[in-house]
Amino acid sequence: MKKHVVLCGITLALLSVGAPLPDRHADDPDLIPDQYIVMLKAGANARDVIVGHGLAPAHHYSHAVHGFASHVPPGQLKMLKNDWRVQSVEPDRVVRLVTHVSATGSAVTVSGEALPTGVDRVDADLHPRKDVSSVGIAIIDTGVDLEHADLNVAGNVTFARGTKSGNDDNGHGSHVAGIAAAKADGYGVRGVAPNAKLYAVKVLDRAGSGQLSWVIAGVDWVTKNAKAKGIKVANMSLGFQGDSPALYAAISASVNAGVTYVVAAGNSGINAALFSPANHPAVITVSAIADSDGKCGGLGSATAYGEDDSFASFSNWGPVVDLAAPGVNILSTYKAGTYATLSGTSMASPHVAGAAAHYLAAYPTTTPAEVLVMLRLNATPQTNACGFDGDPDTYKEPLLNVKTLP
């Protein structure tokens, strides 16, 4: 369980924040030259630092963390790092979707209301609570289709360069949103937490790519607006291999503010501990199973990523993973008012985000740590017959079960 890595994670983060990071652009092509995330010490005036160094920040952070993101000319970097008001200077980097295996999705025509196999498998449709509109879910992603008839979009914001709104120009974020919260209104598809309020927080562009500074800006916005807008859950189906002290600190502060973060484990088929934010000890990290019929028993047809009721061949794994959920051939909403099927831990994660919202609708004062405990207590233990044949590690995370939640 993740509790086994909390102390190591906190120690690493504190050490990293306390010392400037070396320049590693030559070693990591995803680091963006001359772009930095600057964290300031408590009480430092951001404007004074910015003006003093002649910077023009792209983003200001003031709720989850205290600092800014800016282009810093090479000749000024050393002076900035040595400024007594600066806690850390971290290179900005490229962040991508937790690559969904079926890159563009398969278009689907939906008649009436379809019950996706994932929602069926976690028994979300059998829970007596049918409306979760009191809870807000932030989709930190490529945006959400703001006009989709099957989604209750309550607000949007964008931090992706060159965009003017949180509208989805990729499709991934809309798909994630529908899994979590598509309306149960007799039309389209049904989500795990029907009609939950969705907040589109666009931090990735049309290609599903963005910058770490954009993601931190998204987390900062969620933290700022959580109380006023009722945002109790945030889904992040994105990440990168490595660690970021700034992102770690931002998520930690947002969780402390009461937001439950649910994160995809990743699709590299390796240990999820290598990836951020999946390795953050305070988030709920989700792996994926292959399920083709929405039922336990292994009697459905085989998929491209494993037999029915097996651990998805692409899914990351390891002790940082908290729960498993369906993530293969998942039907959900898509951009431009359409529907599509996608595969990936990106699709598994919003099942759990929806379940968290489901529980919080009835118990709104529950802390993120308590939400995880409740989801795990009500989850289905792993058996080879019911979704876990092929899990490569010795730690067997349980399968999400919504029906048994209070």
Which ranges hold each PLM region?
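Gram-negative bacterial Sec-dependent N-terminal signal peptides
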Residues: 2-19
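C-terminal subdomain of the subtilisin-like protease fold in secreted/lumenal serine endopeptidases
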Residues: 28, 57-62, 190-196, 200, ...
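Short glycine-/aliphatic-rich beta-strand segments at the starts of folded cytosolic domains
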Residues: 32-39
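Subtilisin-like serine protease catalytic core
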Residues: 125-156, 165-214, 227-233, 243, ...
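Extracellular S/T/G-rich loop segment that most often corresponds to the catalytic His/Ser-adjacent loop
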Residues: 135, 141-143, 259, 275-361, ...
